[in-house]
Amino acid sequence: MTMSARVRKMALPSNCDLSDVEMICDNVLGCLEDLDSSRVVSRVTSREDVDESTIGDLISLDCVSLETPLFSFLFLGVTLFLFLSLLQQSLVFLLGVFLRLVQLVGHFLLLLMGEQIGVIDKAMSHIPLPEVGQHSQQVQIQHLVERRFGLDVVTAIVVIGDNELFQVVGHQFRVGIMSDGQRSQQSQNSGMNVASSSRGRHQLVPDRPGSQLSSQKLSSLVPLARIAAAEIPCAVQQSLSRLFARSVQNRQVQRPHLDPQRQRNIVGVFGVQHGRAVLLCALGGDLIEKRPNQLVRVVKVLVDKFPRRLPKRLVHLVHLGRGSLVHCRCDRVCQQRGCCHLWHCGGHFFVGLVSWIVDETAACVVFCLFKVVSETQRISSLPRYMHRELNTAGVVWGCGGKHM
């Protein structure tokens, strides 16, 4: 339908004719044609102060202005996300590098500490040891230690495994094999204990660089203070067995095997008080060899049972091979329950737990072996809790009264 037809249908005033309506329609059509974009641009470009580039810029800017907020927010969000991800990865990498450096520094310090201990041991190994074959020499050594430390304990014995007795006398390391129920005989010439076998022979192995001990024997070493005879009286064994059984039963810990009639299963700690030998404590050798962790718990049970009756003075002095004198002075200076001590013998390190135990008759010091570490492995191979205990323990290295 044409425009004129549409106009004819419209209600028109009575004084209007058809020619007037056609003229109005022509004017309207002309105005519509003027609205064409090309004609608008041509008319605008006819002005002197406006060109086509200006109009293009205006049109493009107008289009961009309609899309700028959404595009900007999207671009900024993606950029911020990528930046934070990269920053996080960088921080994690730097933290890992820092922790690795700290670990390397700590490992180096531990190695340095092991080197220092090795140097001390090497220097002490060249110290000339006195001859122990003469009784006068042993008396002189004992008097020397008494004057410098105020002690009357200079030797130690060690019970290993089933029937082997390791004995430290003066400054010499002795190895003897004992049969069941057979006591060690005391030498009248030298004044020292010598372990004899059932076949009537003595096996003496002095401490020298060439003498080596098996790792199985070393793993069960327990240093003890000196006693007059190696055999433990059965009455004392039974008393300690009952005391130990009561303590274990109270805490529901498995009781170790303590046979009063057989010495080979007894590992005891002995001390010297007022010039006489006193049995301090006895434990099962099988328990130390097979279940050391359980023994540590048992020791803690006994310590907790008698926490207050600590002696005013009790000293445990042991000399274990190659001039390495380990001196632990247990008086007011060292009354920490469960402190860890480092022992050394023949190129091996012994880390043990020293605890206080008190019964009705005597004060008890228990040394429990944790681990044997060869000199090549250094201290760094020990578990972390041992490092922590060693740092807080009263470990004194010395030789001839000179502490290191």
Swiss-Prot record:
Induction of synthesis: By growth on oleic acid.
Annotated localization: Peroxisome membrane
Transmembrane feature ranges: 73-93, 94-114, 149-169, 349-369
Transmembrane helix in keyword set: yes
Region (Disordered): 180-214
Coiled coil: none
Keyword Transmembrane helix: yes
Protein name: Peroxisomal biogenesis factor 9
